[in-house]
Amino acid sequence: MTNNGSIELSKIRWRCRRGLKELDFLLLNYFNQKYTIADAEDKEAFLHLLEFQDPALIEFFADPKRIQDPGIRRIISEILGSNDGYQLK
């Protein structure tokens, strides 16, 4: 990986850091485990997801079915492992 590629990944990792540790955990897990092997479409969707503020992200994780953008819905569902959102059981 080039130095520029490494710097770009560091910037994306920094954008995964949020005001809530729960969001840090979810976003950083996806970034660390799946971002580098994701296809271009999923990378673009993840970067778009990072543009949202924390309250919107919380709503996305709570109910992914309500997300209008199919790319973001796919990333959220992949992070959660389902389309049903986070539920206490």
Descriptions of predicted regions:
Residues 2-89:
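Positively charged, polar, low-complexity stretches
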